[in-house]
Curated annotation (Swiss-Prot):
GO terms for molecular function: rRNA binding; structural constituent of ribosome; zinc ion binding. Belongs to the universal ribosomal protein uS14 family. Zinc-binding uS14 subfamily. This is Small ribosomal subunit protein uS14. It comes from the Bacteria. InterPro entries: Ribosomal_uS14, Ribosomal_uS14_bact, Ribosomal_uS14_CS, Ribosomal_uS14_sf. Its cofactor is Zn(2+). Keywords: Metal-binding, Ribonucleoprotein, Ribosomal protein, RNA-binding, rRNA-binding, Zinc. Part of the 30S ribosomal subunit. Contacts proteins S3 and S10. GO terms for cellular component: cytoplasm; small ribosomal subunit. HAMAP family: Ribosomal_uS14_2_B (MF_01364_B). Binds 16S rRNA, required for the assembly of 30S particles and may also be responsible for determining the conformation of the 16S rRNA at the A site. NCBIfam families: PRK08061.1. Binds 1 zinc ion per subunit.
Length: 61
């Protein structure tokens, strides 16, 4: 889990737009966040396997 202070800091509107960054809405992780879902790769994978994301399927080839 991310530090609560950093999660709260990321939720504030930055003084300059370029200073803003995305964090996972579920766990607060700052890296590898998919903007479309607002989730990091780990949470996205867990939720997709559990069937909690509509329209997302595990691919196999």
């Amino acid at each position: 889990m991310a530090k609560k202070a950093l999660v709260n800091k990321a939720n504030k509107k930055p003084k300059f737009k370029v200073r803003g960054y995305t964090r996972c809405q579920r766990c607060g992780r700052p890296h590898a966040v998919f903007r479309k879902f607002g989730l990091c790769r780990i949470c996205l994978r867990e939720m997709a396997h559990a069937g909690e994301l509509p329209g997302v399927q595990k691919s196999s080839w």
